[in-house]
């Protein structure tokens, strides 16, 4: 959802928390809210309202606002964002990862360190390549719904199918 209400963002926090509890066995997942500053007064009207609602919700382990620069810091287990901001974070991360890989490979060629740089680039690709990670699980549906990127190729499709098989085999349920 691109234009979310505060209530919908709180629902996302609940869904994300349940997902992390069930799939990753994190007892009290730390939930952050994507904002343009860590202070509760930062963000647009919806973000400020969501911050207050999450702060008051005793069933959520809310740790506060998270800035984009902290997205991958490990501060939170669940990062709540609307569809527009979340998509921008993901695509920016992929772009930065691909740029870093190119720079690392260029450095390896220039310094005759190609073996080492290939290992580093491979590690980055494994963690940030959408083709390897296949799909995103759409939470809140009664059945499994996985969403692949529009530009996904065969590798991403196979990865998504393997993800679905794993969910089914482990009898993963995302509802109470």
Task: Indicate residue ranges for each PLM-predicted region.
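Short glycine- and Lys/Arg-enriched binding-loop motifs that mark or flank ligand-binding interfaces
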Residues: 28, 33, 39, 60, ...
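Glycine-rich phosphate/nucleotide-binding loop
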Residues: 75-79, 83-176
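Generic serine detector
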Residues: 7, 17, 35-38, 73, ...
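Glycine-rich phosphate/diphosphate-binding loop of Rossmann-like nucleotide-binding domains
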Residues: 3-68
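Glycine-rich beta-alpha junction loops
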Residues: 1-2, 35-40, 66-70, 82-86, ...
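Unusually extended, aromatic-enriched hydrophobic runs near protein termini
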Residues: 1-4, 57-81, 85, 172-176
């Amino acid at each position: 959802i691109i234009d979310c209400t505060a209530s919908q963002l709180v629902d996302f926090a609940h869904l994300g928390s349940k997902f992390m509890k069930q799939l990753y066995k994190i007892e009290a997942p730390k939930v952050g809210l994507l904002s343009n500053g860590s202070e509760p007064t930062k963000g647009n009207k919806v973000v400020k309202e969501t911050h207050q609602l999450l702060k008051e919700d005793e069933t959520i382990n809310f740790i506060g606002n998270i800035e984009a620069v902290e997205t991958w810091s490990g501060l939170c287990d669940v990062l709540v964002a609307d569809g527009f901001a979340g998509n921008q974070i993901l695509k920016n991360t992929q772009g930065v990862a691909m740029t870093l890989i190119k720079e690392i490979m260029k450095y390896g060629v220039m310094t005759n360190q190609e073996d080492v740089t290939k290992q580093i680039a491979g590690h980055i690709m494994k963690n940030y390549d959408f083709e390897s990670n296949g799909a995103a699980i759409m939470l809140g549906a009664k059945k499994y719904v996985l969403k692949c990127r529009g530009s996904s190729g065969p590798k991403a499709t196979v990865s998504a199918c393997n993800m679905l098989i794993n969910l089914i085999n482990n009898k993963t349920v995302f509802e109470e």
